[in-house]
Amino acid sequence: MIRRENRLRREFIFRKSLEEKQKSLEEKREKIRNALENNTKIDYNLRKDAIELAKGSDWGGQQYETDSEYRWAGAQDPKIVITTSRDPSSRLKMFAKEMKLIFPNAQRINRGHYDVKQVVQASKAQDSTDLIIFTETRGNPDGMLVCHLPFGPTAFFSMANVVMRHDIPNCGTMSEQYPHLIFDNLNSKLGHRFTTILKHLFPVPKPDSKRIITFSNSEDYISFRHHVYKTENDGEVELTEAGPRFELKPYQIKLGTLETLAAAEDEWVLRSYTNTARKRTFLSISRADDDE
């Protein structure tokens, strides 16, 4: 079983490396095509191979199966496994139970004394699509790991300002409808990447669903909100918070699963201690940048 997983992983990495080379070649062809159509100078680095690149520039682009790990995500509903760090507090257990109701088709398992490798292998054996692990500090949930199976990526988030359903008065019972998703102000390339990771944790909702989950970005903090709405007789819409609510701060994406993190490549890492870290936003593009 372990040798089979290692072989599949090596094949996946090999196919991805081949597609990266092909993707780089198509980008060069696109530059040549644009230069010829607009009658502009060809990039100095491409002039030597311009004739060869121009020969294949008339062919259409390719779709990359390996480059997008979520290409077939809409073909079937996601199957989520939710667990916690070792020796969880009662508050973290309660939070994991609430988050299990957030994700349709989710299954919560007790961590026990199993290590990460055993948890990932058990999730793969059940044909799960994603593994979510919640961590804590002194009884307060403070971290979320989202690992897409079977080959990654793995996204890391820190959590803050967690308010559970038990702390929200008169929140009522939680709806089990598939929720509609709202992603606000995640318009950069990295923002689209995190949108892809988060939205494929949920199945496709029905049009008449009254449940809404919002991921709203402000200064690289993603606010998670869960609401249910109903239409009154006079046509007004009443919005009720169902909880829980919290803030997510993404800080890393690894191109691998949790048991192979030591050998996995970094797709993106937040560098908090650089001189320009406070001035930059990674998940959104300002309107001034759009105007330029």
UniProtKB/Swiss-Prot annotation:
Residues 78-259 form the Brix domain. It comes from the Eukaryota. GO terms for cellular component: Mpp10 complex; nucleolus; small-subunit processome. Pfam families: Brix (PF04427). InterPro entries: Brix (IPR007109), IMP4/RPF1 (IPR044281). GO terms for molecular function: rRNA primary transcript binding; snoRNA binding. PROSITE patterns: BRIX. GO terms for biological process: rRNA processing. This is Brix domain-containing protein ZK795.3. The lineage of its organism: Eukaryota, Metazoa, Ecdysozoa, Nematoda, Chromadorea.
